[in-house]
Design a protein with these regions (language model features):
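Extracytoplasmic
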Residues: 12-183
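Beta-propeller blade signature
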Residues: 1-7
Length: 183
């Protein structure tokens, strides 16, 4: 859910899609966040619509949000599946004040790197080398010092195969790798 704003005529303006919902501001720039809160998700060829006939076949190259158990199961874990070369997951917004490291939790069958940027064009980014060949969730991390302030985070997979993205963790000097919230 996003906060709605009225214009001077009393009409509602279109709300920006964010990962914050009704948080009334950016999310804290440290801690563990599940990939399912992505507000942007697209493949190398753009976004896909799943309200078309036979979306599984039509959009087989696109990432999507799914879960590991049936609907209604309280223990189901949601994640982004099928991230292939060029796939992007975007999250808005975080108040990042003292970043030191960023970690990601993945599984699947892929070899490449995850680029992390505060812009969707990835002109400046940090790179996390990854190699997975298992359905077991694995962690990868790198230093993060270039992103500060009220920032979006975009994750772009570049490589071979297909990976699943479960969560990411932002670390600062104050909480350097206290992994109590990880799976």
């Amino acid at each position: 859910a996003e906060k709605l704003v009225r214009d001077k005529n009393g009409d509602f303006l279109q709300a920006e899609m964010t990962s914050c919902g009704l948080n009334d501001g950016p999310l804290k720039g440290e801690g563990v966040y599940e990939a399912r809160i992505a507000c942007n998700l697209w493949s190398k060829v753009g976004a896909g619509r799943y309200d078309v006939g036979n979306p599984g076949k039509l959009l087989k190259e696109h990432p999507y949000i799914t879960q590991d158990k049936k609907d209604g199961d309280a223990t189901a874990r949601q994640y982004i599946a099928n991230m292939r070369d060029g796939a992007v997951a975007g999250f808005k917004y975080f108040e990042i004040t003292d970043p030191t490291e960023i970690g990601i939790c993945l599984n699947g069958n892929g070899n490449g790197e995850m680029l992390v940027s505060n812009t969707a064009d990835f002109k400046e980014s940090v790179h996390i080398p990854i190699s997975v060949s298992s359905q077991k969730w694995q962690y990868f991390n790198t230093e993060l010092s270039e992103i500060h302030g009220n920032a979006a985070l975009y994750f772009k997979y570049e490589g071979e195969g297909s990976i699943n993205f479960f969560q990411f963790e932002l670390k600062s000097e104050a909480n350097l790798w206290d992994s109590s919230d990880r799976i």
